[in-house]
């Protein structure tokens, strides 16, 4: 883990000035200092001082699910993990399973419309199948977390980022100790907060 951090720091320090364009605007960024931390840790960084118990922070990303264990406001690196289950893999699996069950090739954007509760032209029965398949995957993820030693019945759980939408809408049961922070910019805001703290600036 420490070796990976050092490699990332060295990589991002190769060039300290980055020039790029985004949506028609030109930008020039000067890198003053490189900070490395788990992605979903940044999403809750501004709240750590108020977390006076055990928490599991779960960030379902595009390719991996990052999990940070927090005890009394401090991340416990030895109990923080990355799981190779996430949205890209799940969507492809759902497309494959829909092909098997219906004989139809369902485009990725139509699958996402159903999962995000947007208007879709898919038959209702197809939409129900897709939602059921996502419920199975969220359940499978939580089973794996339980198998890795996290007690999902009592520990405080916070799902963060875009994947929190999937967990909230497909978890299948209400739990008073589970929260969903569906802010798509949660990690970016957290990185800004952390950088500000380390540079001695007030952010927020």
Write out the residue ranges for each language-model feature.
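Nucleotide/phosphate-binding catalytic cleft detector across ATP-hydrolyzing
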Residues: 1-55, 77-88, 110-204
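Secondary-structure boundary elements
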Residues: 18, 25-28, 50-51, 60-61, ...
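Gly/Thr-rich phosphate-binding beta-strand-loop-beta motif of the actin/hexokinase/Hsp70
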Residues: 47-76, 94
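Glycine-rich phosphate-binding loop plus the immediately following alpha-helix
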Residues: 70-111
């Amino acid at each position: 883990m420490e070796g990976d951090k050092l490699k990332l720091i060295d990589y991002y320090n190769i060039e300290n000035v980055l020039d790029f364009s985004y949506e028609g605007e030109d930008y020039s960024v000067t890198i003053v200092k490189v900070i490395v931390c788990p992605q979903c840790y940044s999403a809750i960084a501004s709240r750590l001082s108020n977390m006076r118990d055990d928490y599991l922070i779960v960030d379902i990303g595009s390719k991996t699910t990052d999990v940070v264990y927090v005890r009394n406001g401090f991340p416990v690196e030895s109990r923080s993990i990355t799981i190779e289950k996430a949205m890209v893999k799940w969507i492809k699996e759902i497309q494959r399973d829909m092909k098997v069950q219906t004989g139809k090739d369902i485009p990725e954007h139509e699958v996402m419309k159903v999962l995000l509760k947007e208007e879709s032209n898919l038959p209702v029965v197809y939409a129900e199948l897709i939602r059921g398949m996502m419920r199975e995957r969220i359940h499978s993820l939580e089973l794996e977390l339980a198998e890795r030693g996290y007690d999902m019945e009592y520990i405080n759980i916070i799902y963060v980022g875009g994947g929190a939408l999937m967990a909230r809408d497909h978890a299948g049961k209400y739990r008073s100790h589970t929260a969903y922070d569906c802010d798509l910019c949660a990690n970016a805001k957290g990185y800004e907060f952390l950088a500000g703290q380390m540079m001695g600036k007030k952010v927020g």
